[in-house]
Amino acid sequence: MKFTIKDVFLVLAVMITSMTSFKSYSQDAHQMWLEGSKGKLYALLQYPDEVKKDVKYPLVIICHGFSGNCESEMQKDLADDIVRNGMAALRFDFNGHGKSEGLFQDMTVPNEIEDLKDVIKWAQKQPWVESIGLVGHSQGGVVVSMVAGELGNKIIKAEALMAPAAVLRDDALRGSTMGAYYDPYNIQGDYVELPGSPEAGSLKLGKAYIETAMTLPIYETARKYTGPTLILQGTHDRVVPYTYAERYHEEIKGSQLKLIEGDNHMFSNSLRQSCQFVANWMKTQLEGWKVINVNI
């Protein structure tokens, strides 16, 4: 089902009429270091203002995409909106990204999966965590979908996939990843040099990343998840064609698919509205009630 950016804005305007004026919670984030697959993971934890002793709260874990980090605008907006909805938000840098330990060259989707599992294990040990939901963007969406498929809905109560990059497997098979071209069956050396960019600079894509991506059972694993699933993507996404979101929708039974007409991979035209939409949706799943019943 497709809806325009204007439609999203109007729906969300209704949803948040009872909310107070905008307040950024990012400055209140608690810096943490958690164990991961390649060393320490840098993380930021935010609580609702009204956090109380001996009270449990839903926790939403947010996963960034390929070459991203937990301090990007999207990650901050998601965390702030989640906290404003009375839940806790934990965002972290995958190994080899941002401030976390490890080399980008050694990063693979399988070891990012292990990173997320390690973060979830930490969350399960916290006495204040009532339930766990996952949000992932791009490659982070693939990681979220596979972890949810592996752990099931007894542990992961809901997942939201924002422009999930299942295309990464096809990219590896055809030898084209983020502007770099290579022979996937005859990689020279230990890595492929990615074109430089203002955001990421020059990065080395490890041979292990390509080899594991080529056989990654993305949909086979993701379809095992039977809990609530939201899939959100723009129809003008040039990084991941929205047909991959449609495939996710077909594979994960009972999932909700929302296509934003004209938006891109980073949700540039609707970032605030999209983050609010995801946070509101997650609240309804983790707290068991809806702010307002709206069919889009």
Q: How should these model regions be labeled?
A:
Residues 79-101:
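Conserved alpha/beta-hydrolase
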Residues 55-65:
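Short beta-strand element of the alpha/beta-hydrolase
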Residues 34, 70-71, 97-128:
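Catalytic nucleophile-loop/oxyanion-hole region of alpha/beta-hydrolase
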Residues 127-138:
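Alpha/beta-hydrolase fold nucleophile elbow
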Residues 136-146:
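Glycine-rich nucleophile elbow surrounding the catalytic serine of serine-hydrolase chemistry
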Residues 25-55:
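N-terminal cap/lid segment of alpha/beta-hydrolase-fold proteins
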Residues 31, 41, 142, 149, ...:
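The alpha/beta-hydrolase serine catalytic core
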Residues 67-79, 94:
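The serine-hydrolase catalytic nucleophile loop
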